[in-house]
Amino acid sequence: MVYIGAESGSDKVLTMVNKGETRQQLIDGVKKLEAAGLKTSVTFISGLAGPELWEEHAIETGTMIAEMNASYVSLLTLMLQPPAPMLEDYKAGRFTLLTPEEVLAETCLMLKYARPSKPCVFRSNHASNYVSLRGNLPMDNESMIASLKRCMEDRGLLKDERFRML
């Protein structure tokens, strides 16, 4: 298995975080690995784009998941820790974190577009996430979206911030 930290499907976001790779390079890499018989596990970061680009981040990530056809996809939620440059941007007011509800809305939108042509194991069960999700794309997209919407309506279902630390 090859693990790939793609972070986002948006070239704007990838540039913003100095990823050093483009969306197309990441897609091509996953496709080559899968074609060679190697399973891939690709990780994306919820909340990475902030409030200005969250919709683009969600849609472009969802369509990237659909296009790359990885064996596994997982989501983590952004947590700013030293020495991350984004932490300094946050402290200086140049970057704003999404609220938990905004992170869930972003994930719903991403799942709407994450329709790979072959089954893909999806996990969002990392300690950083407000809600744990597990399913198979595209078969379980609607049930995962429904779970997220329930959590958006009842904040008591969200993981407490104290338990999101790594």
Labelled PLM ranges:
Residues T40, T61, T77:
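Ser/Thr-centric signal marking residues that sit
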Residues M1-Y3, K39-T43, Y72, P119-R123:
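Structural preference for beta-strand elements that scaffold enzyme active sites
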Residues F44-G47, T77:
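Short glycine/proline-centered loop/turn elements that form peptide/ligand docking sites
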Residues M1-G37, L48-M68, E88-E101:
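Conserved non-cysteine loop/helix-boundary elements of the Radical SAM core domain that shape
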